Amino acid sequence: MENKKMSLWKQSKPYLAGLQFALLIAFIATIVSNIIIVYGPTRIKEMTNILASGLETSVDVAAVAAIGGFLAVIYVIGFLSNYLQAFLFTTAIQRFSERLRTAIADKINRLPLRYFDGHSQGDTLSRVTNDVDTAAQSLNQSLGTVLSSSLLVVAVLVTMFGMNWILALVTVVSTLVGFAFVSVFMGKSQGFFKSQQQDLAAVNGYVEEMYSGHNVVTSYNAIESTKEEFAKLNHRLYDSIWKSQFISGVMMPIMVFIGNFSYALVIIVGAALALNGQISIGIIVAFMAYVRIFSQPLSQIAQGITSLQQASAAMGRVFEFLGEEEMEDESHKERQLSDMKGQVVFDRVSFGYTPDRTIIHDFSATAHAGQKVAIVGPTGAGKTTIVNLLMKFYEIDKGSIRIDDVDTKEMKRSEVHDAFSMVLQDTWLFEGTIRDNLIYNQKDISDERVIEASKAVGIHHFIMTLPDGYDTVLDDTVTLSVGQKQLLTIARALLKDAPLLILDEATSSVDTRTEELIQKAMDRLMEGRTSFVIAHRLSTIRNADLILVMKDGNIIEQGNHEELMEQAGFYADLYNSQFTEGEAEE
C-alpha cells in the first residue's frame, strides 16, 4: 500500500507545480488554527479555577473578563485561519484536477488507435469525467481535514499529557482501542472503492453503446436482453457501492460512540482524582473539552481516510490511463512533401492489429499520380485497414509505404495527414455552425470557396433553406439526413483541397439519387488527384484506373473494370452478384 501511495504521490507532483506556496500557506494556517483550538481550554481551565475559588470569597470579574476577551480574539483568528486554509486547499485541488483533465485530453491525442480498439468509449469517458471528479471531490473534502485533524491530535496529546498524564492515558487508551477496531474496516475499503469506479465505468460504457445503437437494438427486438444485461451491470455497481458506502457510513457512528465512552471515563476518573485532591476542577473541565477535541479529529481522520482511499482508487485509474503507451515520438523526423505529384507505392506491406494475427499479407501496389484507385472485396478483406495504414493511423509491421518516393516512416503523422482529404462512411459533425464544420481547422477559407464546395456536392440549396443558412448551428434541434451529413463531410474534404483523396465507403449510406449526385461531383473534383475509393457498390468505381481486389488481406486480382470482367474471376462474380445480367452487360 505504501509503495502504491508513494507512486501516486510521485505521479501527482508534476500537476502540483506552482501550487506549493499556496499549500504551504494553507499548512501554516492549519497550524495556527490548531494551536488556538488546543490553547483555548487551558484558558478556560484558568477561568474555571478563578470562578471556583471566588465562590468562597469574591469572583475576580476583571480577570474573568480579560480571559473571555482574549478567547474571543483568538477564536476569531482561528476562524479566519480555517477560512484561509479551506480557500487555499480548494483552489489548489481544483487547479490540480483541471491540469489532470488537460493532461488526459492531450493524452487522448497521443494514444495509438490500438488503445481504443481494446477499450470502450464509456470507460475512457469515465476516466476523463467521473474519475477526475471523484478524485477532486474526495481530496477537497478530506485532504485539509485529515491534515488539520492529524496536527490537532498531536497538539492535544502533548497538552493533555502536560496537564495530567493519568487522564491523558485514559483518554488515549479508550480512544485508540476503538480506532484500532476502525482500522480493520479501513483495510478492506480500498478494494471496494476501486470496484465501484470500475463498475461505474462499465455501466457508463454499456449505456453509451446502447444509446448510440438504439435503433439497431429496437429493430432486433433486443430490448429485453439489453435490460437484462444492464440489470446485471447495475446490480454489480449497486453491490460495490453498497459495500464501500456502508463502510464509509459506519465510521462516524463508531467514532461518536468512542468519543462518548472516553468522555464518561474522563469524568469518572477525574472525579476520583479531584476528591483525592490530586487535580483541580478546572483540569476536569479542560479535559472534558479535550476529550471532544481529541475524538472529533480522530472521527474526521477516519472519514477522511475513507475519502482519500476513494480518491486513491480514482486517481489510480486516471494515472493508469496517463501511463498508457503513446504513439512514437516523431519530433526528430524532418522529411516533408513538396510539389507533390501524388504517386503512392505499397511495397510488401504486412500488418496485424495484434502480434499473433496478421491481417495484411505482403501487400504491394502502385497508385500513379492522378489515378483513381478502387479497393474492393468482401467484409473483413482488409480494405479499411489499408486506408488506416496509408494515413499512418497504425504503424506497419513490415514493408514500406512511399508517397512520391518518401517513406512515410520518415515523415511525421501530421505531414502525412496534411497530404490527404478523407471522407468516412461514419460522418462526424460537431456542435457549431455549418460554416465552422465545413472549414474545420483550415485557414484562409473564404465564403466564396465554402459556397463553391457546397454547390459542387449539391448541398448549397438545402443549406440556404435553413433559417440562418451557413450560420445555422448544428445541434439537437437541427435534423439532417444521412445523405446530407455525408454531403457536408465531402464538402469539408473538398475545401481541404489536398493532393490525395480517400473515400472510405463514402456513398454506401445514401440513397441512389444522392449517390449519383455525390459521384458526379467527386468524379469532377478527383481530376488531378490521386484517389483511393473503398465501396461496396461496385457501380461507383467502374471508371477507376486501377481496381485492387482484396480477400483475406491479399490482393487476388488487379486491373481496370473491363480487364477484371474479362478475367471472369472473383471480381466478376462479386460484380454480377450486385446487378442483373442486363445491368452487368451494360
Predicted regions and their residues:
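Membrane-integrated ABC transporters
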Residues: 1-37, 52-67, 85-89, 93, ...
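Helix-loop-helix
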Residues: 53-55, 60, 69, 159-173, ...
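Transmembrane helix-loop-helix hairpins at lipid-water interfaces of multipass membrane proteins
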Residues: 23-81, 161-166, 277-281
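Juxtamembrane loop-to-helix connectors within ABC transporter transmembrane domains
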Residues: 89, 93, 109-153
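An intracellular "coupling" helix at the cytosolic face of ABC transporter transmembrane type-1 domains
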Residues: 17-18, 113-114, 132-139, 143, ...
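Alpha-helical segments in transporter systems
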Residues: 21-46, 67, 71, 86-90, ...
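ABC-type nucleotide-binding domain
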Residues: 330-331, 337-586
